Amino acid sequence: MRPASGVHNVQATMQVNWRGVFPAIVTQFRQDQSLDPDATAKHLETLIQAGIHGVVLLGTVGENTALEYGEKLALLKEMVPVVHGRVPVLTGVAEYTTALGCRFARDAEKIGIDGLMVLPAMVYKSDQRETIAHFRSVARATGLPVMVYNNPVSYSVDVTPEMFVELADEPALVAIKESSENVRRITDLVNLLGDRYILFCGVDDLVLESILLGAHGWISGLVNAFPEESRALWDLAASGCWEQARALYRWYTPLLHLDTRIKLVQYIKLAMAETGLGSEMVRAPRLPLVGAERQEVLGVIRHAIATRPAVGQTIVFRGLPTVERP
C-alpha cells in the first residue's frame, strides 16, 4: 500500500479484489408492490452471465429506504445463494441511526454478504465529526470490508478527501464510491492518499473520465438495462482502447444522464422494461412515469436501442472500424 507524501495515519487494510463493473441492482416488485425475489434473482443471474465483476444490493437504485428492515434481510438471504461466490456481493447500509446501521451490518454479515456499502445516516444531515464517527462505528461493527458511499447530491452529506485522510486508520474501510459529480475528486484522493482506497465511480455519465483518472471500478445503475454495453465500455477503457471507448460512451451518454436525475430509479426500470430485462414497477412514494415525462424518457431509451452498437466478441460501430474485445 502506497500512501501519499505527508499522510501518516494510513493503516494496513483488508485485502479485497473489488474491480470493474458492479451494478447497483434494482429490486423487483410485483404489481401489488410486494417484493418479487424470483424476478430479482432472475435479473441478477442475467447480469452475472453478462460478465459483471460484482454486485451491490440495496443501494439507491435498489430502493433501500423503501424496504422494511426484515424485507432487506429476506432479499439478501435469497440473493446470496444465487451468486454462489461467483462475484463479490455488497449490500447497501442506509439506516436512520448509527446503531441501526451497525445492527444491519451484523445481520448482513451473518447472511454471508461479502462487503458493505455504507451511507451516512439517513434524514439527519450530519456534520464532519458526526459523519466520521458514523463510518467508524459501522466499520467496527463487523469483520467485513466496507465501501464508503459519498453522494452529497442525493444525501446532502459530503465526505471530503480530507475526511478520508482522517478515516484512513480504519482497516475495514477499503473503498470509496465517489458520487459527488466532481470528477476532480478522483485525482484529489489519489494525491492525498495514494492507493489507500479502491476508488469507484458512482456517477454513470462520468465513468470514462473517472477511468482515465484512475478509478478502479464503476457502480452503475444503467448496467441493469444495458449490461453487455457496460461491460464492453469498461473493457475498452481499461485496456486503453480510447477511440472505441469514446465512440461507445458517446452513444451511451444520453442514457447515462438518466442516472443523475431525481427519478433515476423510475428511469432505469423503464429502460429495463424496454430492453426486456425487468419490470418498471416501483414502490410508493415512487410511481411509474406518465405523460410527457414518460414520453421524453422513452424517446431517449428507444433512440439508444435503435442505434445501439453490436457488442460481442467484436464491437461494431457505425462509421468506425470493427474492434476486437480486449
Q: What is each PLM-predicted segment?
A:
Residues T13-N17, D188, Y197, M272:
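Catalytic cores of TIM-barrel enzymes
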Residues P37, A41-L44, P161, R294-I301:
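Short, amphipathic alpha-helical "lid/cap" segments that border enzyme active or binding sites
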Residues R140, P152-I262:
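Catalytic alpha/beta core domains of metabolic enzymes, predominantly
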Residues A50, A74, E78-V83, D107, ...:
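Alpha-helical structural signal in soluble globular domains
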Residues Q11-P23, Q28-S156:
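Active-site beta->alpha loop and helix N-cap motifs at the rims of alpha/beta catalytic domains
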Residues M1-Q11, P321-P326:
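N-terminal amphipathic/basic-hydrophobic helices that include classical n-h-c signal peptides
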Residues L208-P321, P326:
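Structured C-terminal cap/extension of enzyme domains
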Residues W18, T40, K72, L76, ...:
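A general structural signal for well-ordered alpha-helical segments in protein cores
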